[in-house]
Swiss-Prot record:
<dbReference type="GO" id="GO:0006420">
    <property type="term" value="P:arginyl-tRNA aminoacylation"/>
</dbReference>
<dbReference type="GO" id="GO:0005737">
    <property type="term" value="C:cytoplasm"/>
</dbReference>
<dbReference type="Pfam" id="PF05746">
    <property type="entry name" value="DALR_1"/>
</dbReference>
<comment type="similarity">
    <text>Belongs to the class-I aminoacyl-tRNA synthetase family.</text>
</comment>
<dbReference type="InterPro" id="IPR001278">
    <property type="entry name" value="Arg-tRNA-ligase"/>
</dbReference>
<feature type="short sequence motif" description="'HIGH' region">
    <location>
        <begin position="108"/>
        <end position="118"/>
    </location>
</feature>
<protein>
    <recommendedName>
        <fullName>Arginine--tRNA ligase</fullName>
        <ecNumber>6.1.1.19</ecNumber>
    </recommendedName>
</protein>
<keyword id="KW-0436">Ligase</keyword>
<dbReference type="GO" id="GO:0005524">
    <property type="term" value="F:ATP binding"/>
</dbReference>
<keyword id="KW-0067">ATP-binding</keyword>
<keyword id="KW-0030">Aminoacyl-tRNA synthetase</keyword>
<dbReference type="InterPro" id="IPR005148">
    <property type="entry name" value="Arg-tRNA-synth_N"/>
</dbReference>
<keyword id="KW-0648">Protein biosynthesis</keyword>
<dbReference type="InterPro" id="IPR009080">
    <property type="entry name" value="tRNAsynth_Ia_anticodon-bd"/>
</dbReference>
<dbReference type="GO" id="GO:0004814">
    <property type="term" value="F:arginine-tRNA ligase activity"/>
</dbReference>
<dbReference type="InterPro" id="IPR036695">
    <property type="entry name" value="Arg-tRNA-synth_N_sf"/>
</dbReference>
<dbReference type="InterPro" id="IPR035684">
    <property type="entry name" value="ArgRS_core"/>
</dbReference>
Amino acid sequence: MSALLREKFGREVILEKPRDRSFGHFATPIAFALAKELKQSPMKIADEIASSFEDNNIFSRVESVKGYLNFRLSENFLSEYGSWALENPQTFAKQEKKEKILLEFVSANPTGPLHIGHARGAVYGDTLFRLARHLGYDITAEYYVNDAGNQIDLLGLSIQLYGRENILHESVKYPESYYRGEYLAPLAHEAIKKFGLEILSDESRQKELALWAKDGVMEIIKKDLANTNIFFDTFVYESTLYDDWDRVMAKMGDGIYKKDDKLFIASSLKGDDDDRVVVREDARPTYLAGDIVYHNQKFERGYDHYINIWGADHHGYIARVKASVEFLGYDSAKLEVLLSQMVSLLKDGEPYKMSKRAGNVILMSDIVEEIGSDALRFIFASKKSDTALEFDLAEFKKQDSSNPIFYIQYAHARIKTIIAKSDLSHDEIMSATLKNLDESADMLMFDALLLPEIVEDAFISRQVQKLPEYLKSLAASLHKFYYDCRIIGTADEAKLLKLLMLVGLSLKTGLALMGIEAKDYMSKEEE
């Protein structure tokens, strides 16, 4: 529907669902947006637009009401579209977008397991990826591995310190910065097997130890991601990029200059607050240097659009990276940076206590173990990524309707249970018409068929929370319909079961796009 109206008006059209369903299936204030441009009153514009839809068989009624346009879809359109969706479940809500997109997300340092901050960005990125792929975009999910720099050296030191204290039983003085957590134990033991005990005491071999250990940490990270149904197409390692350093610096031209034995990028010329150091006086590259080479490599691969998902603490970093893209000769408008905000975790209303094995962070794997992958994914997709998120684990462990993921999954299971109780065959149900439904059934069908609009809107706006909001609303409509309407044994049993199948398809498709399982059976919730 959005696409039809977008084509008609040559712009994005805001669609609203009227609170009073008697007004129609949806409404739009487009006439108010056009009033200034056309120098006419919204009422007159709305009247003219309504008249232009008179011969359109998609709508049974298009009305102008005080400048608003109210649309009611025709019974034939809804019935035919619903039947088509059930006959073509694999293509329901799909499109054929042509744009080629590179989506980079997570990109956590290979120095320790993922924590809940990483988890939020991971779920956000993977949900965007799933939405884009469903819409037909040629999208690649990429992980940038920051395996160069001080943080890697610190990994080697941390393994040595852990091993000396816990394996050699030495008295160890810890520095101000180091990594901690039980994940270091297997790394220390494996290091001894590979290199011998001396690897724990030889400070000159910290780098060697770290470069070996990072692969083990990446396996931990990949396992954590796989346990939440998150997978990547490509991994790019920072350590492989610096062979291209001289060529990339030459491409930067006047964007790079030397001062006080340092190399700077003239990012202030491109909107940044200041120029930034890319190579220190001791010839060590900064974090930005790796990002410059990486983004050059990205753009040389020829995608149409590039999306980075970063932690909110990287907000100030956007301008300098976009400046480097401009100096490299590319259009920085093709680079979109989305931010993922902080997460606060409660358990029974109290701040969540970190486990001793995790060090000083709350591990993603701990939360998955406690509430499951489905609940974790739902939580992190349920609020705008650039706003702070606080949630209580206890709420998502409840097996009742107060738990939104249980509520949605139970709606799907309820549909399966109702259909299983019927004596009608699958073919008898599928051959039924979806016409001549009463108002409540008609609105439930409309709600189920809204999924394609929601999927496109959630991706284009980058607001993936619109999908779980929709699924929760659809589940509520289904549960209400179940209590208000008798189905089995009625004259309309076949068509009502077909309607429930359509709702089930939307629930299952929507949950799959969130990386969540649609349950076929669940124990009865406490209502």
